Amino acid sequence: MFRTMMNGKIHRATVTEANLNYVGSITIDSAILEAVDMLPNEKVQIVNNNNGARIETYIIPGEPGSGVICLNGAAARHVQVGDVVIIMSYGMFTTEEAKTHEPKIVVLDEKNHIEMILPEEKAHTTL
């Protein structure tokens, strides 16, 4: 049996753009992608902390160091510039792999620079 587990998480990203006329996806600063082991075209789930919306799309890498977090196409309808979002990727693991899997988690500051890297997520973690 395979289990779907969180593989990477970008916590408290601030939306910098929402481009309704783009074909689709989310553009993410490629330096952030590297830190959480996310790849171009990888499926991600996005949770908007401001309005509760949850959407799925795929990644387009943005300019490294730019701090860009841009929701494109239909996904742009679910955010406004300045909204705080959580972006998560998932992987499929055997039960044995899942028991030892350690996801990569980064917390961003208000300018989308990596503020901290969390080695794990504990119950009742608040930032």
From Swiss-Prot:
Cofactor binding comment, as recorded: Binds 1 pyruvoyl group covalently per subunit.
Give the intrachain disulfide bonds. Answer: none
Where is this protein chiefly located? cytoplasm
Give the highest taxon in the source lineage.
Bacteria
Reported modifications of this chain? Is synthesized initially as an inactive proenzyme, which is activated by self-cleavage at a specific serine bond to produce a beta-subunit with a hydroxyl group at its C-terminus and an alpha-subunit with a pyruvoyl group at its N-terminus.
Q: Give the Enzyme Commission number.
A: 4.1.1.11
Reaction catalysed by this chain? L-aspartate + H(+) = beta-alanine + CO2
Localisation = Cytoplasm
* Residue numbers binding substrate: 57, 73-75
Gene3D superfamilies xref list:
2.40.40.20
Named cofactor requirement(s):
pyruvate
First-level EC class? lyase
Per the record, its GO cellular-component terms are: cytosol
PTM annotation (Pyruvic acid (Ser)): residues: 25
Q: Can the keyword Lyase be found in this entry's annotation?
A: yes
Q: Name one GO molecular function term.
A: aspartate 1-decarboxylase activity
Which residues participate directly in catalysis? 25, 58
Task: Cite the entry's keywords alphabetically.
Answer: Autocatalytic cleavage, Cytoplasm, Decarboxylase, Lyase, Pantothenate biosynthesis, Pyruvate, Schiff base, Zymogen
Q: Where does this protein act, in terms of pathway?
A: Cofactor biosynthesis; (R)-pantothenate biosynthesis; beta-alanine from L-aspartate: step 1/1
Family assignment from sequence similarity: Belongs to the PanD family.
Q: Which HAMAP family match?
A: PanD
Q: How does it assemble?
A: Heterooctamer of four alpha and four beta subunits.
What does this gene product do?
Catalyzes the pyruvoyl-dependent decarboxylation of aspartate to produce beta-alanine.
- What name appears for this protein in its UniProt entry? Aspartate 1-decarboxylase
